[in-house]
Each structure stands twice: as C-alpha cells, then as structure tokens.
C-alpha cells in the first residue's frame, strides 16, 4: 500500500467505526490518517472535524475545541455546523462569551444564504405532480432552531434576558411552537 492508499483506508475505517459507534477505533483510524504524509488536505480536514466530534461525544470539550480551532484555521469555507459545535463545546466549559461569538457566526452563515424559492408543478387537472421548480426568486436563509435556542440559553447565563426577544420573534415565525408564543407573550 502507498501512503495515499493507507490514508484512504484509515478514512473509511474511521467513518465506518464512527457510524458503528466504535468511537475509540474511529479516533485511532482518524489519527492514523492525519499521520500519513500523503493524505490529502480534504481527508485531513475531515478527520480533524470528526476527531472534534468524537472528543465532544467523549465529553472532552477542551479537546473538541482544540480540534475545531485547528479545523477552522485550515478550512476555507467553514460550515455553520462547525461553528455550532464549537459554540456547544464552549458552553460546556462555561466560556459563554466565546460560545456567543461562535453561535453568532453559525447563525450569520445560515442567514446569509440565499435559498431558491420553489413551487409545485401542477398537472392539467391542477393536481401536484410531486415535482418542484425554482421561481428564480430567493429568500433569506434561516438558522437551525437549536442554534437560536443555544443563543437564548447563553443570554440567560450572561444575564441578558431582554435580548431573547428578537430570537423569540424569529422562532415563532420559522419554528412556530406553542411554548415560543407563550414565552414571547410573557416578554411583552
């Protein structure tokens, strides 16, 4: 096997072990991948991100943060999920200010996306065919519900209770649940 072949083998082993919840074996495979000199940047980055998740699962939040910061340093377009995980890890170690910064970045990434508006295609009788077409228009992206909820929890920890009002307004618009309406009305 070449170093490149071994790197691919370690990548797939890590992936399989992770999906089978054999976290120790997955971690070993990903660390072996990183040690391979001919592993690609993409494989290395994927392994580092997976290691951050594995450290989080093991409740080693500082280890998770270390891997996530390394991943962010080398990732051209970091995902909102990466920042969301970083925010959760910072929350767990009670670094609430850094957690707010990370969750704000996650939300900004998601809200800055332009989502194409799609409509259903109708047949001659006016029934939906199951096919969707884009209208050419877009709408603003919306962050994941759990990112908004984490931000509210952080504001509570930081004693900024009134700052949750705009978050509840977003939640009732995009994730309408009775508890959000109840809490929003209580703030007014």
Model-inferred region functions:
Residues 3-11, 40-50, 75-85, 114-116, ...:
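Generic helix N-cap/helix-start motif at coil->alpha-helix transitions
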């Amino acid at each position: 096997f070449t170093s490149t072949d071994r790197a691919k083998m370690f990548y797939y082993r890590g992936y399989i072990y992770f999906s089978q919840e054999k976290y120790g074996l997955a971690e070993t495979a990903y660390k072996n991948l990183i040690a391979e000199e001919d592993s690609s940047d993409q494989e290395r980055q994927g392994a580092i991100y997976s290691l951050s998740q594995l450290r989080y699962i093991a409740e080693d939040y500082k280890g998770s943060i270390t891997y996530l910061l390394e991943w962010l340093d080398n990732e051209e377009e970091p995902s909102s999920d990466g920042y969301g995980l970083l925010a959760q890890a910072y929350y767990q170690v009670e670094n609430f200010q850094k957690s707010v910064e990370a969750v704000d970045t996650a939300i900004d990434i998601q809200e800055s996306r332009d989502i194409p508006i799609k409509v259903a295609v109708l047949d001659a009788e006016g029934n939906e065919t199951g096919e969707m077409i884009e209208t050419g228009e877009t709408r603003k992206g919306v962050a994941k519900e759990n990112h908004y909820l984490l931000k509210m929890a952080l504001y509570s920890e930081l004693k900024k209770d009134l700052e949750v009002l705009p978050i509840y307004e977003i939640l009732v618009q995009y994730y309408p649940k009775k508890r959000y309406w109840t809490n929003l009305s209580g703030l007014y």
